[in-house]
Amino acid sequence: SFPLLPLIGAERAVGFANQLIKPLFQSLEELIVLLAKLKMTLHPSLAVVVITGSYGKTTFKEMLASALKTSYSVLKTPQNINTRLGIAKMIIKDLKKNHQIMIVEAGAYQKGEIKKICQLVRPSFGVITIIGFMHLERFKTLTNIRQAKMEIIPFIKDKKKLFIPAADH
């Protein structure tokens, strides 16, 4: 039982408990990301494709993986896993020596998330599918959405390996 419950009420007690455990979960996430980064250093020749956008990420990822797997050993993020933590877990669990290409779906619910994913996987290729009004309630403006998706650009050194749509939808 939670001794403060009668004094502060259930809602505040839950909020208090959440504040107590939040740093623990954040530290655990950072540890998982660090382990994934270390594992990535063991694969210097791995080609990494990061796919972001408002729509079509999962479909494009699946189509690209299907086309490439006939000639290469390909690892891709499962289903619609597209967060830094989900990607880090996949790297730790599934990345093997024989993989030549890793295809990563990168989602964002706020600015900075695409950047953090790119810092983790260090992409060789970047794809932005369509930039639209998905998650407008979180980003507030289409400009903010566009800026979040464009965080991929500085990580692609060879701009011939960066694919961006000609217009937003």
What are these regions (language model features)?
Residues 1-162, 166:
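Phosphate-binding loop of NTP-binding sites
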